[in-house]
From Swiss-Prot:
Annotated residues for binding of NADP(+): 17, 23-29, 64-66, 86-88, 127-134
Record-given protein name: Dihydrofolate reductase
Primary gene name: DFR1
Catalytic reaction list: (6S)-5,6,7,8-tetrahydrofolate + NADP(+) = 7,8-dihydrofolate + NADPH + H(+)
Source taxon at top rank: Eukaryota
Known function: Key enzyme in folate metabolism. Catalyzes an essential reaction for de novo glycine and purine synthesis, and for DNA precursor synthesis.
GO molecular function: dihydrofolate reductase activity; NADP binding
Cross-referenced InterPro entries: DHFR, DHFR-like_dom_sf, DHFR_CS, DHFR_dom
Amino acid sequence: MQTTAKSSTPSITAVVAATAENGIGLNGGLPWRLPGEMKYFARVTTGETPSSDPSEQNVVIMGRKTWESIPSRFRPLKNRRNVVISGKGVDLGTAENSTVYTDIPSALSALRSTTESGHSPRIFLIGGATLYTSSLLPSSVPSLNSSTSTSPLPFSRPLIDRILLTRILSPFECDAYLEDFAAHTKPDGSKVWKKASIKEFREWIGWDIEEQVEEKGVKYIFEMWVLNQ
């Protein structure tokens, strides 16, 4: 199990596949069928050696529509703690290792109280568009700027601090879109996000991933973006 040091501000990684125009969905599902990309998603979010103890497994946070878009035979996503965010509630049926919360802060508070001290499982945000958008915009998370910063205004960082982006290079029709995070800037004009090197990406996920893949005639590249601190 891959873990990350516990802190007052949990590290949250968004995992998303998007076209060059930032399209991520169509009619409540994915516009593409790429088994290899789905295997990558499962491997990243599960971790290389998932624990048999549910309380130590990685966490996947998703909105209600994303939960419902997963075929019932695959719900909950196995070897991961499934967290569904919904203000209206969701009937999870008999799904094990799955919980509903009204918002992400409530989920994070509960997760902190149920994980062992010292280290915490990795936390992944997996959709949909509404949660991605709210988590990419500046939040109440403490400022990234130090006390000696010359920035004219304080900057409240986004809720997430890492993005694993699969950039789909082929065109697809979409009706749901990812926030254009790469264009976000701080008050001093610097970029909020920076693209990590492929070396840094491989070190973080723990295996030697190919940077570009072609599957079923569709080309896509794997990228990791981190907060520009």
